[in-house]
Amino acid sequence: MKINEFIKNNLKVKVLNEDPSMRHIMTSTRLPHIVCTDGFTMSVQVGYSLYSEPKKVAKRYSKVEIGYPSERESLLEEYVELSIFDERFVDYTDTIYPYVPVKLVDKVLKKHGGIDLTETLRKAA
């Protein structure tokens, strides 16, 4: 399953303001933490206040926000948002990765055996 299909099937949207002029910016969106078949996990999020494109609820996304992968993933490194307090210590798992292209996310998922949908949804419940 590719990431846009996962988003389409699992995105939870809560409208916080019914005013039509505010509706697109007053929403809360949430996706379950992804678990891959090899055990790798990461958060993938999209929406107005997140590092994704587009920044609204959409049918397809070109870029997504990734957060807190369970291990360092070399395919994502160029997108890491780091706060380096000590140059000898860089934690690639306790941070976010803004505006990651969905094609790259699909490569990461494939590398880790794809999404284990049963485990992903079980942990989200």
What residue spans do the PLM features occupy?
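Surface-exposed intrinsically disordered loops and tails
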Residues: 5-23
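Polar low-complexity intrinsically disordered regions enriched in Ser/Thr and small residues
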Residues: 24-26, 70, 116-117
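Amphipathic, interaction-prone secondary-structure segments
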Residues: 19-62
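Low-complexity intrinsically disordered segments
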Residues: 73-125
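Generic structural hydrophobic/aromatic packing signal, biased to beta-strands
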Residues: 34, 66-68, 105
